[in-house]
């Protein structure tokens, strides 16, 4: 099940915890809606769209299939490490696993600003990787098990 960011924003105005009300929601497509995750993750009545999406990403699906958040980032904001650092901090302090893929689209002239990384968490037996795709304009932030079925995960990334 998927949801566009525009529909999500409208639904969130009616039911603030809409993402928790949809336990099988796997994809949010916000490529053209201009928002990214915000921390702290929260889905209460005063939470922003970005906080609610962060809360949704960090709530695992019951079948261990990764959630997918597709977004684009506005390069005029300037401080891009501040967008990625909360993911690293949450990963470093995690005690339970969660699977997700964040597909981030950039303007071509700004894609150089990001440095790929790969981290592991021995307690959760997970890895967090930020890497460029075949396109110079798209990066993936992937949180997944260290030992995983590569074919299954590659299918999810498409």
Q: Could you say what each language-model-derived stretch is?
A:
Residues 1-158:
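The conserved beta-strand core of Leucine-Rich Repeat
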